């Protein structure tokens, strides 16, 4: 046998081996397909279990909950009822804890109530809503502190600064948490007072009564609902604090007025890690030791001498 014949024979054996390997693969192709179908079903089941576990830290409104600790089982919509007992100083402290509390402690209904308790609703609510209530509160507090330091007697500046800072720890009274009269503008408030007076109701809030749309009847003035039994006032607007998720899971329903809205309590993801921390720290500057140089300049700008400057900077 020549060399060329041997090469041809080797090439023929190589082709036979390739053909036989392809046939073997085709014979085993159907069983593999069956295994793939089983594996696909198992994969779906596993994915479903993973989704259920992941959704364990989410409520029906698709808002994330706290991932660990005793608050993991608390529905998101209940946090506003927990945080409404806190002062502005406490809310700012909560916002520094984690992403979720930063989101929950910035609730507009909380800061609107604190703002109106401290300063009253001096301007039409539509104009005020051009900015967030939290920002309005912090800006107004900072302006008041600067103005107080400029105008108060230099000998008593320390005490005035202490008194002004103490206002940040003012929490709502029980009557202010069940009654929304404090957040009404003067025009609507006058209408509410006249109606209550005509029905023999006083302006004092009743704290032992829980208003519900299923058991109470109401008199309505615009978006204000007045309980005919107690006279307690509820404002049902974009910042309504009494909303819950409907059984269908697609609308938020006020438990007092029955008004529905499609506004869900959704926590938006930050653009980058640590974004919420930076924002919370900036907002907390007025309440903490941050931005000391800026406040030192503002508080000491009108000091007459070095001794007065030193006394002022103790509280910067």
Curated annotation (Swiss-Prot):
One of its GO terms (biological process) is ubiquitin-dependent protein catabolic process. Residues 68-114 form the F-box domain. Part of a SCF (ASK-cullin-F-box) protein ligase complex. Interacts with SKP1A/ASK1 and SPK1B/ASK2. Residues 22-64 have a biased composition (Basic and acidic residues). The F-box is necessary for the interaction with ASK proteins. This is F-box protein SKIP31. SMART domains: FBOX. The keyword Transcription does not apply. The gene is SKIP31. PANTHER family: F-BOX ONLY PROTEIN 3, F-BOX PROTEIN 3. The keyword Metal-binding does not apply. Pfam families: F-box-like.
């Amino acid at each position: 046998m020549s060399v060329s014949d041997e090469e041809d024979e080797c090439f023929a054996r190589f082709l036979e081996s390739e053909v036989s390997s392809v046939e073997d693969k085709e014979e085993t192709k159907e069983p593999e397909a069956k295994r793939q179908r089983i594996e696909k079903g198992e994969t779906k089941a596993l994915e479903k279990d993973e989704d259920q576990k992941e959704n364990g830290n989410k409520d029906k409104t698709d808002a994330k909950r706290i991932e660990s600790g005793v608050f993991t089982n608390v529905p998101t919509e209940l946090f506003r009822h927990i945080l409404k007992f806190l002062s502005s100083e406490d809310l700012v402290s909560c916002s520094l804890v984690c992403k979720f509390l930063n989101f929950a402690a910035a609730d507009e209904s909380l800061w609107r109530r604190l703002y109106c308790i401290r300063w009253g609703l001096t301007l039409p609510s539509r104009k005020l809503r051009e900015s967030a209530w939290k920002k309005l509160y912090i800006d107004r507090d900072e302006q008041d502190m600067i103005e107080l330091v400029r105008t108060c007697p230099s000998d008593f500046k320390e005490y005035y600064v202490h008194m002004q800072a103490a206002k940040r720890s003012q929490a709502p009274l029980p009557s202010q948490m069940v009654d929304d009269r404090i957040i009404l503008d003067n025009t609507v408030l006058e209408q509410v007072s006249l109606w209550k007076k005509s029905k023999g109701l006083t302006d004092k809030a009743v704290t032992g009564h829980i208003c519900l749309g299923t058991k109470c009847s109401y008199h309505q003035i615009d978006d204000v609902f007045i309980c005919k039994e107690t006279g307690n006032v509820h404002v049902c607007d974009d910042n309504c604090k009494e909303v819950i998720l409907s059984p269908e899971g697609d609308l938020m329903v006020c438990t007092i007025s029955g008004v529905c809205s499609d506004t869900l309590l959704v926590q938006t993801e930050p653009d980058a890690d640590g974004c919420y921390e930076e924002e919370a720290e900036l907002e907390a500057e007025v309440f903490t030791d941050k931005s000391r140089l800026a406040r030192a300049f503002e508080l000491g700008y009108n000091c007459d001498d070095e001794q007065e400057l030193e006394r002022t900077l103790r509280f910067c």
